[in-house]
Amino acid sequence: MTVKNVTGYSVTTVPEHVLGMIFALKHSLAGWQRDQITGKWTESKQFCYFDYPITDVKGSTLGVFGKGCLGTEVGRLAELLGMKVLYAEHRNATTCREGYTPFEEVLKQADILTLHCALTETLKI
């Protein structure tokens, strides 16, 4: 069986899903949901329940690996939300193309990483 890249596939659905996951991560939705289901939320002695951190998406830095249709659309939507977007240059590149940030620098600066590149032998770490 041969697996191929499908250019232009899910260019709306995948970026929207990525943004949903970013909100879930930054707002600790899994923890909140778990505590609501188990009833822990109702044990709170005050009107609010604060067991998990909530951090703003706006002002966060997103590292995008892959600047094709999907990576570009994720970056565009993230910028609309007020995120700083860094597109990663190839690992071990000797020069950095315009519009890209060195690979290691993206790893250092980004609060969140999203991967939108094919898994090829040259991209394996």
Task: Give residue ranges: language-model regions.
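N-terminal Rossmann-fold NAD(P) dinucleotide-binding loop
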Residues: 71-72
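NAD(P)-binding Rossmann-fold cofactor-contacting core
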Residues: 77-97
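Structural signature of beta-strand start/N-cap positions in the alpha/beta core
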Residues: 61-63, 84, 111
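Rossmann-like adenosine-cofactor binding region
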Residues: 90-125
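Short beta->alpha connector loops at strand-helix junctions that form conserved
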Residues: 1-9, 89
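Hydrophobic beta-strand scaffold residues
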Residues: 2-3, 85, 100
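Glycine-rich Rossmann-fold phosphate-binding loop(s) that bind the pyrophosphate
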Residues: 67-68
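Phosphate-binding beta-alpha-beta segment of Rossmann-like dinucleotide-binding domains, i.e.
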Residues: 6-61
